[in-house]
Amino acid sequence: MENVTHSFVFLAHWPSAGSFGLNTDILATNLINLTVVVGVLIFFGKGVLKDLLDNRKQRILSTIRNSEELRRGTIEQLEKARIRLQKVELEADEYRMNGYSEIEREKANLINATSISLEQLEKSKNETLYFEKQRAMNQVRQRVFQQAVQGALGTLNSCLNTELHFRTIRANIGILGSMEWKRKLN
């Protein structure tokens, strides 16, 4: 603050044209000072600033290149994932369709096998019934025959006496003898 006060004190004592003094025109002074400072900065700082800007530019370009490479890699991975997803979806649809076809085929096979089993079971049942019927009929015939034979034997035993028995034997011997004689003639 003291320097500022001294500056204003010297304003009153402006030296003549050939001497060194204080320029009181603030705008002109700042402009000259700024020009000198900027000139010095440009002269000395130009290389440093250029190197800093070049390094910054190289880092930015390198970051952009890396980002582009990452973007390309990500796009490639995304495309591969999409292709893989499409393949998986197609396989899933194929498995689904094959599964439905296989289920329908197995269902038809099961129905056919069940139908065949039922037909065979029906045939076996009918055969069993037929054989049981035949067996029952044979048993009935056998009982009827046995009863008829027993009845006939009972009737014959009650009707036959010894004399009738001898006559029947002689008649049968005569029939057998005549059959034997005819046979010898032929």
Curated annotation (Swiss-Prot):
Keywords: ATP synthesis, CF(0), Chloroplast, Hydrogen ion transport, Ion transport, Membrane, Plastid, Thylakoid, Transmembrane, Transmembrane helix, Transport. InterPro entries: ATP_synth_b/b'su_bac/chlpt. It is a single-pass membrane protein. It is found in: Plastid, Chloroplast thylakoid membrane. The chain crosses the membrane at residues 27-49. The keyword Secreted does not apply. GO terms for molecular function: proton-transporting ATP synthase activity, rotational mechanism. F-type ATPases have 2 components, F(1) - the catalytic core - and F(0) - the membrane proton channel. F(1) has five subunits: alpha(3), beta(3), gamma(1), delta(1), epsilon(1). F(0) has four main subunits: a(1), b(1), b'(1) and c(10-14). The alpha and beta chains form an alternating ring which encloses part of the gamma chain. F(1) is attached to F(0) by a central stalk formed by the gamma and epsilon chains, while a peripheral stalk is formed by the delta, b and b' chains. Belongs to the ATPase B chain family. In plastids the F-type ATPase is also known as CF(1)CF(0). This is ATP synthase subunit b, chloroplastic. It comes from Agrostis stolonifera (Creeping bentgrass). The lineage of its organism: Eukaryota, Viridiplantae, Streptophyta, Embryophyta, Tracheophyta. The gene is atpF.
